[in-house]
Amino acid sequence: MTKRKSANLDAPIWFDGTNINEALFCDEFLNSRKIIFANGAFFTPDGRVTDDLPLRGEIYEKLKCCAVNNIPRKITNILEVMKLAAHVEDFAPEADRIHLANGTLKLDGSFTEGRPNIVRSRLPVAYRPDAPAPVRWLSFLDGLLYTEDIPTLQEFIGYCLIPSNKGQRMMVIKGNGGEGKSQIGAVLVALLGSNMKDGSIGKISENRFARADLEHILLCVDDDMRMEALRQTNYVKSIVTAQGKMDLERKGKQSYQGWMFARLLAFSNGDLQALYDRSDGFYRRQLVLTTKEKPAGRIDDPDLAEKMKAEVEGIFLWAFEGLQRLVANNFKFTESQRTRDNREAVKRDSNNVFDFLESEGYIRLKADCTISSKDLYEIYRMWCEENNLTPLKRRSFSESVIASQTKYNLEYCNKITNAAGRRVWGFFGIEAIAKPNINGFSDVSERTYVPDRWQE
């Protein structure tokens, strides 16, 4: 009969001289460390564990005194057991405070030093209320953006400091290239650390797994947004407006409910357009800032980003001021007339129905008049042809006009009488002026209706 090895009195309680008891190891480890496992991730007083290599290193330091085989596999097994031992059902975000390198700052301005508690996220910047003003940063913004648009950026960056989507806005900063707008992203890395990630709005719109990559993230930056219109917008809209948990899915795994509070920021040479979504909601959620023209002969400083990063404590105070202003305004962003005009221009560029309804010489908005949907679309096609524009499909056109009923005092119904005397779908409130292919007139190509007497 084989005798069991005598116990080593100096050995840890979880090691019997031959084997490691993972459960006992985890109990001892968790008694000496503040760590929990929730919502698919480990959290410590430093925030979410984004790389488990340091944690594996700590476990290795404790195991190396024990002569056991295949330590890497043992460490992996211990981490899996630790997920069970440290598991808590949920770890809700705290939107009323910002955890910083040297303490916690609440939105009311009160600050508590130290980092005793486990937190969801901790920014790598320290709170120094007497930090000098970020002179280089402010000078950079003054050269990049119009003065009245800088408060909007200030509020949006402040908005990204807390895990909340109450503002329900994303931001697009648009320029012709070379202005230096992407330097903002480099500074935000210093401000947010691992709580920010690079991404692609196009990928988010197309890939149902991309949303899960933004779980626990405060900000996703698309440094060079591609110009193609989005085929789908529902994923992007759901992220911008998410309040609480949403359904997330990772490849090969069952979908689950996860916290989503990522904000979206894109730098681009063009607009964020939708291929099929003509709804007001998609464009209403965009804050579109345009940059100033790059001055001729300007010499760019290759070290500007590093110099601005050195001002990160002052930049944090500047952003926190914007956040407090946003909260005081019930999460309604400050918008200049230029910003509002930018959004309207993006909306109209993607949907020429608005320009058509406001055009002259084709239709007239008149309360006691009616027009069938078919006739209205034919006039719209003629307007597009004469203005060298691409017409929408019939269904998209009708949906756009229906969505604009309130704005233009229209009523969509099936009580319209067409030229043949039949009841069809159409609109109250529109009178036809131009009449292509209406009332029997047609020709080889579509053109404006010409009276018979003009053809004699």
Where would I find each of the regions flagged by the language model?
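Loop/turn-to-beta-strand initiation segments
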Residues: 216-219, 260-264
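Intein modules and their embedded homing endonuclease domains
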Residues: 2-127, 259, 372, 392
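Conserved nucleotide-sensing/catalytic segment adjacent to the nucleotide-binding pocket
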Residues: 210-253
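Positively charged interface segments
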Residues: 76, 192-194, 199-208, 230-233, ...
